[in-house]
Every structure is written in structure tokens, then in C-alpha cells.
Amino acid sequence: MKITWLGHAAFRVETAKAVILIDPFLNGNPGAKGIDFKEATRGVTHIALTHGHGDHVGDTVAIAREHGATVIANADLASWLGSQGVEKLDPGNTGGTLAHEGFTITFVNALHSSAMLTENGVSQALGNPNGLVFHFEDSPTLYHMGDTDIFSDMAFINELHQPEIGIVPIGDRFTMGGAVAALACQRYFNFNSVLPCHYASFPIIDRTADKFIAGMADHPATKVLADPAGTVHSFQA
């Protein structure tokens, strides 16, 4: 399996049977400078969304139309995407597991919000925010936390799914900051590797992963992969 951070909370996950984009906010993403859009979206089979904010839905509609990708999202967000012309949708909700070729995806809790600003300036709620747990046939289990704060039920996510790779928001203000994110990783999980995200994009959130790296310094069993956007990481089962 290969995982590429595309800036902010966007990731490309490649396995033998699927190419999954998570929260594909590319155009207009300050953290995606230098990312080639065509290369980032090449061969995409699925798009998985954690919630309905514009910096996570991003280019979903355009990518889904161009590639015929299946979009996996909370039921309310999926309904909205359908109204925008997305044809291949697989809706779910918190606690649900969906099966696709080569992997399953489970919707778990996240402490955040989920809405889209409509053309008339009204904020439209788009269901609950989620974290997403991916179980693959031939690769380590991956948990993208979405946008969230720390919460004690992370312990149940670890008990049920035992994720080996964590994608963790660290930018503060709209999610937990680096020190709290490090505490979440150490207290509730046994990750082999973690990829921090939701930083180094907008100027009002943290510009570096320094606080997270410092917080993880006394937990050497977990490898922190805080590399620049565009870096490809490979993982074996």
C-alpha cells in the first residue's frame, strides 16, 4: 500500500485493487502547492469523505464525474452530492461498515461539525462528521481521524479495529493541536506509523508539526511521518 499526503487533510491511498482519495481538497488548497492534480487523481476508483466542509469535500464532484469514482460519505452528505450530479454514491453513517473490492470502510465518531454554505449564504447541515477506518485485504489497517478533538471513545475504536496507521489532525483552532493529538495517539492507540495532517495550509492553523513531533518524542514505537506534501510512503501487510 502507498499513501501520499496531498496537503491539508487530503490523501491518496493506493492498493492492489483500489485507488482511494480521502477528502480531496486540491484546487485552492494552500498546502497542495506543487501537487499535480492529474497525477494525484490518476486512476482513482473511490473517494471517501470525513465530513461536509469545503476544505474536505474539495474537488469531489469534479473528480467523481471525470473518473466515475464511487463516493463514500455520510448519508446526508451523500444526498447533497447527488444533488450536485455525483452518480456513484455509497452512503453510510456512524457505526456502519461498507464493503468494496479489496477493502471495507467503517464510519466512526469524530468531534467536529459538518456543513456547507449554500448559494444564498445559509449554512446547510450535512450530517455528522466521521473518522474512517479502512481494513484492507493485503495492507495494514488505516484510521483517518477526520477533523476532531481527543475523546475517550477512541479507546473503543482501537479495541474494535486495532489500526496500525493513523492519519491525525494536529493544526489546532478547528481540530486538536499537536500536543493533544500526540496524547490521543499514545493513550488510545498502538500505531506503527502516524501521518499528521490539517496543518501547513491556512495561516490561522499551525504551520509546522513541531508540537506533535515533540509530543511523540517519548513514544519511539510509533514512527511519525511528518514529511512534505507529495511524499509517498509505502507500507507492507
Curated annotation (Swiss-Prot):
Sorted UniProt keywords: Hydrolase
Name used for this protein in its record: UPF0173 metal-dependent hydrolase BOV_A0561
Keyword Phosphoprotein: no
Pfam families: Lactamase_B_3 (PF13483)
UniProt organism field: Brucella ovis (strain ATCC 25840 / 63/290 / NCTC 10512)
Entry keyword annotation includes Translocase: no
Entry's family note: Belongs to the UPF0173 family.
Lineage of the organism: Bacteria, Pseudomonadati, Pseudomonadota, Alphaproteobacteria, Hyphomicrobiales
One Gene Ontology MF term: hydrolase activity
